[in-house]
Amino acid sequence: MSKKKVVVSLGHESFGNTTLAQWDAVKVTAKALADLVEADYQLTITHSNGPQVSMIHKAMTELRRVYIDYTPAPMCVCSAMSQGYVGYDIQNALRAELLDRGIFKTVSTILTQVCVDPYDEAFYEPTKLIGRYMSREDADIEIKKGNYVREIPG
């Protein structure tokens, strides 16, 4: 087993904004990752998932508008879903690239959870756009539920 270890962190912008763009992006990324494996590195791969969480959350919210009895998934579940599908795509692309090179190594995806302080002051001034655009009325409803929203100029 390799003693050389490296953590690779993939940024969310590197995945594109559609499923097809993500598949193309992870195929390119898998080649670079496989190069590291070939060089006898043991990899741990992390990735950002903000845009993917947002896409899932928007889809769930829209589904709720069509099917009134549907209960939308909370943001934490949308985050887990995005970890799963992004990890799945990276895992499959890397496994395929390794097999193409005659390298037989296990590739696994692990979901994570993060504990945050709900009273952290950063929540009062959100800086990342996650979720859908909403009317002032919808924003007021979310605020009454205890969610943080931010007005985007424009």
Regions found by a protein language model. Name each.
Residues L63-G154:
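Ligand-binding beta-strand-loop-alpha-helix segment within the catalytic cores
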Residues V8-L10, T44-H47, I103-T112:
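General beta-strand structural signal in soluble alpha/beta enzymes
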Residues S14-G16, G50-S54, C115-Y119:
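Short, active-site-adjacent cap segments at secondary-structure transitions
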